From Swiss-Prot:
InterPro entries registered for this protein in UniProt: PRC-brl_dom, PRC_barrel-like_sf, RimM, RimM_N, RimM_N_sf, Transl_B-barrel_sf
Domain writeup: The PRC barrel domain binds ribosomal protein uS19.
Assembly, per entry: Binds ribosomal protein uS19.
Native species: Rhizobium etli (strain CIAT 652)
Record localization: Cytoplasm
Name recorded for this polypeptide: Ribosome maturation factor RimM
GO cellular component terms given for this protein: cytoplasm; ribosome
Gene Ontology molecular function terms on file: ribosome binding
Length: 193
């Protein structure tokens, strides 16, 4: 853990540390990788306060992984990490393993959500999974964030190069009535009379 402080440019959340496991400094962690034990394949993990963590050992246990980090040698040191989120730089994720229609959730943040008429419904500010399917958080200028389902019905197309998502506002729950679509223009200011 005595690595130099690291400031990440484009951090991607990889794991959240839970409680201590045993007396040797091991911790339980929730890994956000397809294969939880692959967490060790990404090199050093970093906290947002700049600390760097090297995984020495990792094993699966029920719904978590048990991890031993260099420099964390006793239960007290392990307990001090409870709740800490660990990140890697986005550039460290392997793009060559992705199919043409695959992407990382981190790549969705910042995309503008538009309908087929070009009306903007906001920018993606987060991707969440609360257990009933993935949700995208959209936030427009001066508006409260809204969550829409991240499904084929709601999100029709993702264009990372153009920085846009094509959405169906009706399927996404942003409008209740198809007739409202012609009236709804959230990205255009109202005209003064």
């Amino acid at each position: 853990m005595k690595e130099p402080m690291t400031k990440l440019e484009n951090p991607v959340l990889m794991a959240t540390i839970g409680g201590a496991q045993g007396l040797r400094g091991e911790v339980r962690a929730k890994a956000y990788t397809a294969d939880p034990t692959a967490l060790g394949d990404y090199g050093h993990l970093h906290s947002m306060d700049g600390r760097s963590f090297e995984i020495l050992e990792i094993r699966e246990m029920k719904n978590v992984v048990v991890v031993r980090f260099r420099g964390i040698n006793d239960r007290n040191a392990a307990e001090a990490l409870n709740g800490l989120e660990l990140y890697i730089e986005r550039d460290n994720l392997p793009d060559e393993e992705l199919e043409d229609d695959e992407f990382y959730y981190a790549d969705l943040e910042g995309l503008e959500a538009r309908d087929d008429q070009g009306v903007s419904y906001g920018t993606v500010t987060g991707v969440f999974d609360f257990g009933a399917g993935d949700l995208l958080e959209l936030k427009g200028p001066g508006k409260r964030p809204v969550l829409i389902p991240f499904s084929e019905a709601s999100v029709l197309e993702i264009d990372l190069e153009a920085g846009t998502l094509l959405i169906d506002p009706l399927a996404a729950g942003l409008v209740d009535d198809p007739e409202e679509l012609s009236k709804f223009t959230p990205d255009k200011p109202k005209k003064k009379k």
